[in-house]
Amino acid sequence: MSLINIHNASLSFSNLQILEKSTFHINKNERVCLIGKNGAGKSTLLKIINKKQDLDEGQIIYKKNTTTAYLEQNNPKNLNISIYDFIALGLKEHEKNKKKHTNEIVKIEKIIELIKLNKNTLLSHLSGGLLRKVALGRVLVREPDILLLDEPTNHLDMKTIKWLETFLKKFSGSILFVSHDRNFIQNVSTRIIDLDRGKLVSWPGDYENFIKLKNESYRIEKIQKQLFDKNLEKEEQWIRKGIKARSTRNEGRVKKLKILQKEQKDYKKIEKINNIEINQSKNYLGKIIFKLDNIDFLVNNKIIIKNFSSIIQHGDKLALIGDNGCGKSTLIKIIIGENKPQKGKIYIGKGLKISYFDQNRSFLNPNKSIIENIDYGKEKILLNSREQHIIRYLKNFLFKPNQLKSLVKTLSGGECNRLLLAQLFLKPSNVLILDEPTNDLDLDTLQLLEKIIIAYKGTVIIVSHDKTFIKNTAKKCWFFEKNGFINTHFSQYDSLKKEKNNFHKEKIQKNKSKINLAIKIKNNFKKELNAILYEIETIELDIKTLQKKVNEPDFFKKTLEEKLPTLKMLAQKERKLGKKILFWEKLEKNIINTKI
């Protein structure tokens, strides 16, 4: 039996249909990714499963004694509490009587050890990424059968995302998570459920396979809709000509027409953002946009940036990459003049028009409407010297005319980011600065944003932890190391292996007195590296074969005894792969640190 079964579920808010006679299930040991457009109802579905939202119709059946734990999309707001006490609140017994039983203390200490943070630290002292990690700890302490995670990678840096991927793969229960991080989905999910226009559709396989199948289904749907429209038009022409004789055949045709007209009325068209322009300014002078000479920046005597020099040229597509709190947003503020360095000089090019996407959404007024947040609510806007009605412009960002007077504070995270992009793209610019633009955006909007950045003729500076987004947009990377050092890499971000290799490349110092010995040691490491890479490739092939079996449509219909050997073997191979990768990383580090 499945852990959870949802049957014929329907739910609507005002005119928005969230679920329409939808059915799906979650089996034991599944890691299911819930995908859908912004505002489709993904977070609502998690709340339904967590018993925080009722259905209008249908039923949800839980296997006896099944427990759930829910990680919300937003970080905690009450920050005047220690990490220990916050995680302890995840235990229902602790919430009821506040008694710290030995068993509870062991559970809490175990989670704190897992997230590797000081239990006495107040939440108010943590970054957004660390708050996310602590919120996850509060969920995990309950040891649920099903983890419900809403955008778990938001605010997390690459290192923490990798930690989360590893943890979730080892998690003994089932997971239903919402995410738009394509690399994370590809690495973690065993199945994908798509919430599309009120319907829940289960897709076998991984994310890349899902995209192929989804695009094909859209193509087929469009063809079917064209044939439907032609048939409807034909029947309506027939009825307009008048019915000459009352006959059973004619009555049947009239009934058929009414059915077709109802289907036409009920049809929900595919909504995609596909017609967005950006207001590009051409009034720039010279090739150099920003020049940084020997920049030092400290906060409370802590070195954030040390002796950094570089040049940003016109047309650069630059990504800033590093852990949370390493100074990426600080450097952006130095570049645009909001922060002054303690040492060094900054040259800013002439004629620059900068559009800045702020991850905190500080440019949106939450107490004003959608339309009031765009060009002061003017009826007509100017886009690349062409006048356009504000309603038409916002329609391109999937905002319907009847919702334009809605206050910004009522919007979802993804809708806020779409509005911020609408605001940003209207402002004439030749420099785009995007600080965490991918948070909460659905996959269609992400892919369109990538196309806009690629086609943009000006300069783009990106801060993001989304590997796929960086790989698809950036042509140049700055890697933030410890102690304020920044390494520049003048080519595309490709993979984590390449990142790690290039991240440390400039550290290698040549030592002529020990060169022969160093070369010999390095060659030995390389031989070991080649051997371990072969083992990794072999294990990955085994995992791929096993995953194909697991992703077969009938696999989860088998009995537990039939499924268990395959699932156990897959888990063993994944654990083995993890160990081999750790050994590979150690060898790479040895090679990098061997000075020649």
From Swiss-Prot:
One GO MF term attached to the UniProt entry: ATP binding
Cellular location(s): Cytoplasm
Record-linked CDD domains: ABCF_EF-3
Binding site for ATP 1: G36, K37, N38, G39, A40, G41, K42, S43
Keyword terms, alphabetized: ATP-binding, Cytoplasm, DNA damage, DNA repair, DNA-binding, Hydrolase, Nucleotide-binding, Repeat
ABC transporter domain mapped to chain residues: 1-222, 290-516
One CC-aspect GO term: cytoplasm
Binding site for ATP 2: G322, D323, N324, G325, C326, G327, K328, S329
InterPro entries for this protein: AAA+_ATPase, ABC_tran_Xtn, ABC_transporter-like_ATP-bd, ABC_transporter-like_CS, ABCF_ATPase, P-loop_NTPase, Uup
Catalyses which reaction(s): ATP + H2O = ADP + phosphate + H(+)
EC number: 3.6.1.-
Gene3D superfamilies for the chain: P-loop containing nucleotide triphosphate hydrolases
SUPFAM superfamilies per record: P-loop containing nucleoside triphosphate hydrolases
Chain positions covered by the region annotation C-terminal domain (CTD), binds DNA: 519-596
One of the GO BP terms on file: DNA repair
Predominant location category: cytoplasm
Family: Belongs to the ABC transporter superfamily. ABCF family. Uup subfamily.
Note on domains (UniProt): The C-terminal domain (CTD) helps bind DNA.
Function of the protein: Probably plays a role in ribosome assembly or function. May be involved in resolution of branched DNA intermediates that result from template switching in postreplication gaps. Binds DNA and has ATPase activity.
Protein name per UniProt: ATP-binding protein Uup
Gene name as annotated: uup
